[in-house]
Curated annotation (Swiss-Prot):
Region (Disordered): 1-112, 118-137, 324-352
Organism: Homo sapiens (Human)
One Pfam family in the UniProt entry: CCDC34
Role this protein plays: Involved in spermatogenesis. Has a probable role in anterograde intraflagellar transport which is essential for the formation of sperm flagella.
Name of the protein described by the UniProt record: Coiled-coil domain-containing protein 34
Residue list for modification Phosphoserine: S52
Gene this protein is translated from: CCDC34
Length: 373
């Protein structure tokens, strides 16, 4: 007997790549299993026909008849008791195998239709024909344990099929999300490239505008500089012309002034020369002064005439000069009083006066004589 659980024979290593939906069957002729296949345009299930491995030698005809309906998804029990108990087991096994094969083909086609979202008319016609060929097993030939076992296996099969469908749907959703993510990524990259290109174009335009603006400002500054230089040259020429005119006028005035001064000097010279000639003429006829000079000749005082001596003054002040009395300052008086505390002895003061006596001789003019009175 086989081990309890999945109730399936052990597969060789070549059948390990198939999905859980692939089940061994009693007949090695034509079995099918649904394998997820991804194409260029969509995803879905593709029905792959694969020969079932041969059952072990220990399996009898009754065991094959017991295990053959396990892959039948749409298997239903007959409530009416059949009368064909006397038929041979070989015919029953062949009928059950054909029904299981037809039901599996229908399940695979239905799953492919659900996943791909499209069904062909040919598959529908085949399914209708297969549904008509289904043969319900009489319940009288199965024991209660077999009925329970088959129901459990059908539930397990349905659960596994639903799980496979859910996993496949999840894979499809994940793949769709990945495709959408890749699409969004490509769109984002394209938008980023467009944005970068736009920014570069904008920067280039701004740079060109800046360069053009700088060149325009530079040209305007150069034009303004040239205009200012020309204006400055004109102003300088006007100023230079004005200065030259002023310099010429100043030199002209200086020449006129110098000429006038020379004329005045010449006139003064002429007048002075004229006056000198007149004085010289008059001096010849003017009487000489008396000999008022004195000198010693042969040891005797004698008078003689000298033209170098000063003439006798015509007037002199007969009142002798007296110095003005200036009282000493108070501070000096106080300081002198503090320094000398000795009693001052009064001495008789001899009044003297200086009298300027001008001798009548020319030898000692302005002689000071001290006369004591």
């Amino acid at each position: 007997m086989w081990a309890a659980g999945r109730w399936g024979p052990t597969f060789p290593s070549s059948y390990a790549g198939f999905s859980a939906d692939c089940r061994p069957r009693s007949r090695p002729s034509s079995d099918s299993c649904s394998v997820p296949m991804t194409g260029a345009r969509g995803q879905g299930l593709e029905v792959v026909r694969s020969p079932s491995p041969p059952l072990p030698l220990s399996c009898s005809n009754s065991t094959r008849s017991l295990l053959s309906p396990l892959g039948h998804q749409s298997f239903q029990f007959d409530e009416d008791d059949g009368d064909g108990e006397d038929e041979e087991d070989v015919d029953d096994e062949e009928d059950v195998d054909e029904d299981a094969h037809d039901s599996e083909a229908k399940v695979a086609s239905l799953r492919g239709m659900e996943l791909q979202g499209c069904a062909s008319t040919q598959v529908e016609s085949e399914n209708n024909q297969e549904e008509q060929k289904q043969v319900r097993l009489p319940e009288s030939r199965l024991t209660p344990w077999e009925v329970w076992f088959i129901g459990k296996e059908k539930e397990e099969r349905d659960r596994l099929q639903l799980k496979a469908l859910e996993e496949l749907n999840q894979q499809l959703e994940k793949r769709k999300e990945m495709e959408e993510r890749e699409k969004r990524k490509i769109i984002a990259e394209e938008k980023h490239k467009e944005w970068v290109q736009k920014k570069n174009e904008q920067k280039r335009k701004e740079r060109e505008q800046k360069i053009n603006k700088e060149m325009e400002e530079k040209a305007a500054k150069e034009l303004e500089k040239e205009y200012l230089q020309e204006k400055a040259k004109e102003k300088y020429q006007e100023w230079l012309k004005k200065k030259n005119a002023e310099e010429c006028e100043r030199k002209k005035k200086e020449k006129e002034k110098e000429k006038q001064q020379q004329a005045e000097i010449q006139e003064k010279k002429e007048i002075a020369e004229k006056k000198f000639q007149e004085w010289l003429e008059n001096a010849k006829h003017k009487p000489r002064p008396a000999a008022k000079s004195y000198g010693y000749a042969n040891g005797k005082l004698t008078g003689f005439y000298s033209g170098n001596s000063y003439p006798e003054p015509a007037f002199y002040n007969p009142i002798p000069w007296k110095p003005i009395h200036m009282p000493p300052p108070k501070e000096a008086k106080d300081l002198s009083g503090r320094k000398s505390k000795r009693p001052v002895i009064s001495q008789p003061h001899k009044s003297s006066s200086l009298v300027i006596h001008k001798a009548r001789s020319n030898l000692c003019l302005g002689t000071l004589c001290r006369i004591q009175r």
